[in-house]
Swiss-Prot record:
Keyword Cell inner membrane listed: yes
Class of this enzyme: translocase
Entry keywords, A to Z: ATP-binding, Cell inner membrane, Cell membrane, Cytoplasm, Membrane, Metal-binding, Nucleotide-binding, Protein transport, Translocase, Translocation, Transport, Zinc
Protein topology in the membrane: Peripheral membrane protein
GO molecular function: ATP binding; metal ion binding; protein-exporting ATPase activity
Basic residues: compositionally biased ranges: 894-904
InterPro entries per record: Helicase_ATP-bd (IPR014001), P-loop_NTPase (IPR027417), SEC_C_motif (IPR004027), SecA (IPR000185), SecA_CS (IPR020937), SecA_DEAD (IPR011115), SecA_motor_DEAD (IPR014018), SecA_preprotein_X-link_dom (IPR011130)
Protein name in UniProt: Protein translocase subunit SecA
Source superkingdom: Bacteria
Stretches with biased composition (Polar residues): 853-871
GO biological process: intracellular protein transmembrane transport; protein import; protein targeting; protein transport by the Sec complex
Length: 904
């Protein structure tokens, strides 16, 4: 109550921020007449003037009025478009490390040119991040003329570009690309074997378009570069045959382990668990199939991988549905993004889940992979000095943006008042009744010439609606993961009079639906159109546009509520752009997933009290409130999971930063011999201490063990027992010194053979390769630790603190192993002649260049909904697969098995 009163008196933080910024907008508007007088050359010269002022110590924020006025004028001359005042506000919000919520159709792409230009003046680079390659290319090419007019360079960062082209793109003042590609380049740079192989500069300023999609929806998605692991495809096939024989428990009571069925399903957290009966049943079937020995337990340590196969197969059969979570195309399982409805070609679920789905569908099973490098989007984007983003729907996630990314959300007002009518939800008892009502609504509206956009949450649902429309004789177009090639075209024409378009979820995001259709698309189909043809097309469009407005504008139909209010708002936001007329309504049934899982008891109770008859709908504020509360519950739990994942990942992030920092220092230094010498002393001291304890009696020494260790691990033949027998005066200190000096002398002989420079290169290569190999193993060990750490809670221990403590101990052990491995490899290596080493280096360079041209990226993602502790790491992973005989992704030019795949 008190907060509401204070807000009424002083205004909200959002209002105060906008009031402050409007004063700057007024200043920019006052500058406009003067800027208009400048010639093109004088306008372009302003960029050099701004750069000079920055070099002389000016603060970037002091340039905002002039810089924005210059960009606005340049836009008028290049595009014939003038930035609205609200776009200037949006530009200032984006410069202040904030999220700008700007409604659909308000010109976010043009708004982004303002902060992009301003922050590029420092010469440190600006990354404009989009959700797909099409938008990255489109926005870069559309805005290139403006930036080049002002003397700035523009680069596009796309998958499969050769390294020199990527380096040039990053060297540009403003670089457009996708979140995936920026993240993968960061990982690849930290696998490089020379400074020249890196492509990115320091991460300065990132401007993220559709920021909610990237920083919220994909927050659980790690980017992974991986290599091949052991082939176990046969086991997936054998286990897959057993799963259909298991029976689901009918009642999901609290005691799932003691249930009557073989497995229970927790739909809220998307988990499946074997019951006691199920465990006995699966063990019997595994024994019958000859997979497990009689009397063995599935939970015994020897069968841990078998348990992994059973769990993956059970999840594949029960939780993942064809044409909802994935499609099968050309003998391949392709994931469908739950947030956009788009197919994610090349992405794969991790932890054997994808292989289990492939076995279920009877397609070829691809090998599992082992992580070489990994980072989540949460941690990647927090590496930027300055981060900002824009979207049409951010306010519902404002708390998460603030708590995780330290980004405030500012709602930017629309240029024209929003007049869309958002009608109350209609709730039916059954899915069939709901679909019937939707068809009738579409029939009535299209009869009046009103275009309709139907939003569904899955391919399966879109095909059900499509089939019913076909049966009713209503023409329509379907836009889902199966037909996404024509996405932009279908969406742009969805505003034609009487058009009916079915869109899975938020497919087509980034393309506006213009009432009356897109006249630009019609002109694009003509070869060299005349002015008369263009005028005729525009005139015909104007008639259609006016007719659609008269019919009520675009009508949005949601076939069910999404778990997140934000996704529902995105669907609604397709109508009512730039002050146009429009309307929206959601149709729900008690059989919808959200209603069934979260709101069923309360709403069905209301419906019974009201005496609902078949075909009747309930429309009541209580129902709308119950649904909103259900969505808040899901959003809250999703946020808690993302936050928990981040807390765990922050531990790995600190270690990643330390490793990558050390690695970059190694890359930038030509001579690492001092480091090698220091490490050698530490390693030999540790080895000798384990056989000859400090200040111990000679009877306690294990001389034979020490001789064997030096021979096996360092290829050093040292007759220590003979020395002690021949030289009674040889004591502990002098013995230690002799062993170390002989090891150094042996190494120096090798250096004399190959030469100083070659040995320095070799040392550097061994250190980098060993570091990468051990880091890869450490990542796998961290994953295993993470999977079981929640069990510490049963021992009254805090799992997070235990994870931090143990992961630090593992990290320290890894660094000790690094020292040991490096000295061991350098001591045992058989050196080549300088000519051979040089020839190998030339070959490596040539292969690295060839690799850059042929690199193929594939990504891995898990769009499974919610996960509990032990399942957290099964979260989505974007993965790049590398075969044993493929070129190593680090860019060394060697085969993977001879480079990062060697020291395993």
């Amino acid at each position: 109550m008190l907060i509401k009163l204070l807000t009424k008196v002083f205004g909200s933080r959002n209002d105060r921020t906008l009031r402050r910024m409007r004063k700057v907008v007024d200043l920019i508007n006052r500058m406009e007449p003067e800027v208009e007088k400048l010639t093109n050359e004088e306008l372009r010269a302003k960029t050099d003037e701004f750069r000079e002022r920055l070099a002389n110590g000016a603060v970037l924020e002091t340039l905002i009025p002039e810089a924005f006025a210059v960009v606005r004028e340049a836009s008028k001359r290049v595009f014939g478009m003038r930035h609205f005042d609200v776009q200037l506000l949006g530009g200032m919000v984006l410069n202040e490390r904030c999220i700008a919520e700007m409604r659909t159709g308000e010109g976010k792409t043009l708004t982004a040119t303002l902060p992009a230009y301003l922050n590029a003046l420092s010469g440190r680079g600006v990354h404009v991040v989009t959700v797909n390659d099409y938008l990255a290319q489109r926005d870069a090419e559309n805005n290139r003329p403006l930036f080049e007019f002002l003397g700035l360079s523009v680069g596009i960062n796309l998958p499969n570009m050769p390294a020199p082209a990527k380096r040039a793109a990053y060297a540009a003042d403003i670089t457009y690309g996708t979140n995936n590609e920026f993240g993968f380049d960061y990982l690849r740079d930290n696998m490089a074997f020379s400074p020249e192989e890196r492509v990115q500069r320091k991460l300065h300023y990132a401007l993220v378009d559709e920021v909610d999609s990237i920083l919220i929806d994909e927050a659980r998605t790690p980017l992974i570069i991986s290599g091949p692991a052991e082939d176990s495809s046969e086991m997936y096939i054998r286990v897959n045959k057993l799963i259909p024989k298991l029976i689901r428990q009918e009642k999901e009571d609290s005691d799932t382990f003691q249930g009557e069925g073989h497995f229970s399903v927790d739909e809220k957290s998307r988990q499946v668990h074997l019951t006691e009966r199920g465990l006995i049943k699966i063990e019997e079937m595994l024994v019958e199939a000859g997979i497990m020995e009689e009397g063995e337990s599935l939970y015994s340590p020897a069968n841990i991988m078998l348990m992994h196969h059973v769990t993956a197969a059970l999840r594949a059969h029960v939780l993942f549905t064809r044409d909802v979570d994935y499609i099968v195309k050309d003998g391949e399982v392709i994931i469908v993004d739950e947030h956009t409805g788009r197919t994610m070609q090349g992405r794969r679920w991790s932890d054997g889940l994808h292989q289990a789905v492939e076995a279920k569908e009877g397609v070829e099973i691809q090998n599992e992979n082992q992580t070489l490098a990994s980072i989540t989007f949460q941690n990647y984007f927090r590496l930027y000095e300055k981060l900002a983003g824009m979207t049409g729907t951010a306010d519902t996630e404002a708390f998460e943006f603030s708590s995780i990314y330290k980004l405030d959300t500012i709602v930017v007002p629309t240029n024209r008042p929003m007049i869309r009518k958002d009608l109350a939800d209609l709730v039916y008892m059954t899915e069939q009744e709901k679909i019937g009502a939707i068809i009738e609504d579409i029939r009535e509206r299209t009869a009046n010439g009103q275009p309709v956009l139907v939003g569904t949450i899955s391919i399966e649902k879109s095909e059900v609606v499509s089939a019913e429309l076909t049966k009713a004789g209503i023409e329509h177009k379907v836009l889902n993961a199966k037909f996404h090639a024509m996405e932009a075209e279908i969406v742009s024409q969805a505003g034609q009079p009487g058009a009916v378009t079915i869109a899975t979820n938020m497919a087509g995001r980034g393309t506006d639906i213009v009432l009356g259709g897109s006249w630009q698309s019609e002109i694009a189909l003509l070869e060299n159109p005349t002015e008369d043809q263009i005028a005729a097309i525009k005139a015909a469009w104007q008639i259609r546009h006016d007719a659609v407005l008269a019919s009520g504008g675009l009508h949005i139909i949601g076939t069910e509520r999404h778990e997140s209010r934000r996704i529902d708002n995105q669907l609604r936001g397709r109508a009512g752009r730039q002050g146009d007329a429009g309307s929206s309504r959601f149709y729900l049934s008690m059989e919808d997933a959200l209603m069934r899982i979260f709101a069923s008891d309360r709403v069905s109770g209301m419906m019974r009290k009201l005496g609902m008859k078949p075909g009747e709908a309930i429309e009541h504020p209580w129902v709308t409130k119950a649904i909103a509360n259900a969505q808040r519950k899901v959003e809250s739990r999703n946020f808690d999971i993302r936050k928990q994942l981040l807390e765990y990942d922050d531990v790995a992030s600190d270690q990643r930063r330390a490793i990558y920092s050390q690695r970059n220092e190694l890359l930038d230094v030509a001579d690492v011999s001092e480091t090698i010498n220091s490490i050698r002393e530490d390693v030999f001291k540790t080895v000798i201490d384990s056989y000859i304890p400090t200040q111990s009696l000679e009877e306690m020494w294990d001389v034979e063990g020490l001789e064997q260790r030096l021979k096996n691990d360092f290829d050093l033949d040292m007759p220590i027992a003979q020395w002690l027998e021949d030289e009674p005066q040889l004591h502990e200190e002098t013995l230690r010194e002799r062993i170390l000096q002989l090891a150094i002398a042996d190494y120096q002989r090798k250096e004399e053979v190959v030469g100083f420079d070659m040995m320095r290169n070799f040392e550097k290569g061994v250190m980098l390769q060993t570091l990468d190999s051990l880091w890869k193993e450490h990542l796998a060990a961290m994953d295993y630790l993470r999977q079981g750490i929640h069990l510490r809670g049963y021992a009254q221990k805090d799992p997070k603190q235990e994870y931090k403590r143990e992961s630090f101990a593992m990290f320290a052990a890894m660094l000790e192993s690094l020292k040991y491995e490096v000295i061991s490899v350098l001591s045992k290596v058989q050196v080549r002649m300088p000519e051979e080493v040089e020839a190998l280096e030339v070959q490596r360079r040539e292969e690295a260049e060839r690799l850059a041209k042929q690199q193929q990226l594939s990504h891995e993602s898990d769009n499974s909904a919610l996960m509990s502790q032990e399942e957290a790491n099964v979260a989505a992973s974007l993965e790049r697969k590398v075969g044993r005989n493929d070129p190593c992704p680090c860019g060394s030019g060697k085969k993977y098995k001879q480079c990062h795949g060697r020291l395993q």
